[in-house]
Amino acid sequence: MGKMAVIAHGGAGPGPERQENLQKAVDVATELLLAGASAIEAAVEACVVLEDDPVFNAGTGGVFRNDGSVLLDASIQTSDGRIGFVIAMPDTPNPIRVAADLLDENINGLTGLGARKWADNRGHANRPVEGREPIEGDGDTVGVIVRDSSGAMACATSTGGCSHRPPGRVGDVPLPGSGFWVDETRSVAATGEGEDITRALLSYRVSSRAESPQCDSLMDAMRWGLNELIPDGASVGLIALGKDGAGVGLSNTVMPWASWTED
């Protein structure tokens, strides 16, 4: 059983300075783990910190779509095989909470107004998200991976979507294997240009690559993913956490990330 650990990223792309903001989320997850929280609880609450911070393109900081709407995606997966995701949710400042509520349901994902109605029935906050204008090169996703004292892992991701996209567009964040992947041995989360991440099925293939005898480490698998699966010029980053050891991050562009590992 590995020691407890947390790793989080604040999106691929230059954007505003956000390293200290990201560290606050890692600190929240750390405090929860030390108090006995599960990987799911710590990952969700750390992601909520990022959704509540308008510097990030997620939750309250979600960017406008082409029509001026703010539609939010989020996902969570656990090392025991559960998944929850929501797509294009309106009026939902913390979509990760809704996604997490799906973990124990007989459905994995919900979209749009159907997701909002389901969230209303579960008592999730329903209030307009003001949104903001896209910033050129803005980071497009937040992600948190946690390993708790039992060795269980959870990955939570959230986004307002890439800048300058139509209201029906779906990126990598809510798509298992693309924006995230968790199994019993490791967890991977991606950020950046969602179409390229999705075409590559990046998170799943990086995780699978780590099993290969040609691969020496998670970092080696991540480097392979960025170099071999992502086209030149596409800005993409990855974070990952194994069943032991510290989390690692790698990007072909600016990607703030922060981590903690139990002493």
Regions found by a protein language model. Give the residues of each.
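Alpha/propeptide regions of enzymes that mature by internal proteolysis
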Residues: 1-263
